[in-house]
């Protein structure tokens, strides 16, 4: 997986709490098990006025020209709630998002995001509200998210965030479960070499 140390990007505000995984990627689009191709269906029922996804909803925030190319999503509490589907972070990353900032996340979504190099950043409700106001008042504003130093820099201020040290290590080094295992390849080989022949 790609390493994540620091990211600077345009921010789009999704001013809604309790955004569930069915809103992020509706169930009718979950027929694939590969990670690509889901971005075009991200927030499908909100982005489009028709079932075929041909008529963009001009009122939905992702369709507004000022947020085109955004790579940081600013959201409200309990983002990613609902059913467990790894397709949700797949859709967000395939669309182009690298970071989601919110006061809280559903636990399963939070873990799935970290496993797929999408950084979920938890900030206080007060800090998130400040950031919403900042984005509304400054068209084209970018945030700098520094995973190594665990800070979000925006509007001349720095907002610290917490993340599990193991998860942080994996993201910074681009390690998934296979990559973590391969870090111990030499130890595994030595162990296997010590096994009795009848076990091989």
Swiss-Prot record:
Entry EC number(s) = 4.2.1.33
List the disulfide bonds in this chain: none
Q: Which Gene3D superfamilies match?
A: Aconitase, domain 4 (3.20.19.10)
Q: Which molecular function GO terms apply here?
A: 3-isopropylmalate dehydratase activity
Pathway it works in: Amino-acid biosynthesis; L-leucine biosynthesis; L-leucine from 3-methyl-2-oxobutanoate: step 2/4
Q: Which InterPro entries match?
A: 3-IsopropMal_deHydase_ssu (IPR004431), Aconitase/3IPM_dehydase_swvl (IPR015928), AconitaseA/IPMdHydase_ssu_swvl (IPR000573), IPMI_Swivel (IPR033940), LeuD (IPR050075)
Sorted keywords for this record are:
Amino-acid biosynthesis, Branched-chain amino acid biosynthesis, Leucine biosynthesis, Lyase
GO cellular component terms listed in the entry, alphabetical order: 3-isopropylmalate dehydratase complex
Q: Name one GO biological process term.
A: L-leucine biosynthetic process
NCBIfam families associated with the record: leuD, PRK01641.1
Q: Its family?
A: Belongs to the LeuD family. LeuD type 1 subfamily.
Q: What is this protein called?
A: 3-isopropylmalate dehydratase small subunit
Q: Which organism is it from?
A: Serratia proteamaculans (strain 568)
Q: What taxonomic classification does the UniProt entry list for its organism?
A: Bacteria, Pseudomonadati, Pseudomonadota, Gammaproteobacteria, Enterobacterales
